[in-house]
């Protein structure tokens, strides 16, 4: 859950767009993407795989039942607070890992290459 002190401390995951504090990413990793991102314990990796620049917030309580979750492609993700749009791209090694597992990396900034 987001810290009580507000938005200024939140970072967004560049893969799934979940919002957490820097400390939460550092101590717990990403609840959706940790097996690929491996942020837990690495401040450098948290900085590479998350962004302070994002627009909008979505409180997702029942992702599997939400049209907003389907629209944002987070309907199979954990409950939490998500950004609508995140500025930045995941590192190439992350994109390669997603593709090696048969997935497709979809940037969260809504900008087409």
Curated annotation (Swiss-Prot):
C4-type ZnF: 13-33
Any one Gene Ontology BP term: transcription elongation by RNA polymerase II
Signal peptide (residue range): none
GO molecular function: RNA polymerase II complex binding; zinc ion binding
Subcellular location: Nucleus; Chromosome, Centromere
Pfam families linked to this entry: Spt4
Keywords: Centromere, Chromosome, Metal-binding, mRNA processing, Nucleus, Transcription, Zinc, Zinc-finger
InterPro entries: RPABC4/Spt4, Spt4, Spt4/RpoE2_Znf, Spt4_sf
Any one GO cellular component localisation term in the record: DSIF complex
Keyword Phosphoprotein: no
Similarity remark: Belongs to the SPT4 family.
Assembly and binders: Component of the SPT4-SPT5 complex. Interacts with RNA polymerase II.
Its job: The SPT4-SPT5 complex mediates both activation and inhibition of transcription elongation, and plays a role in pre-mRNA processing. This complex seems to be important for the stability of the RNA polymerase II elongation machinery on the chromatin template but not for the inherent ability of this machinery to translocate down the gene.
Protein name: Transcription elongation factor SPT4
Source species taxonomy: Eukaryota, Fungi, Dikarya, Basidiomycota, Agaricomycotina
């Amino acid at each position: 859950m987001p810290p009580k002190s507000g938005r200024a401390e939140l970072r967004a995951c560049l893969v799934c767009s979940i919002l957490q504090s820097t400390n939460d990413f550092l101590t717990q990793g990403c609840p959706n993407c940790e097996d690929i991102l491996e942020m837990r314990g690495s401040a450098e990796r948290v900085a590479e795989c998350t962004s302070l620049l994002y627009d909008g917030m979505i409180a997702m309580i029942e992702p599997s039942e939400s049209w907003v979750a389907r629209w944002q492609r987070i309907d199979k993700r954990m409950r939490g607070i998500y950004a609508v749009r995140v500025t930045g791209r995941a590192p190439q090694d992350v994109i390669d890992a997603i593709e090696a597992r048969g997935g497709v990396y979809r940037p969260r900034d809504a900008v087409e290459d």
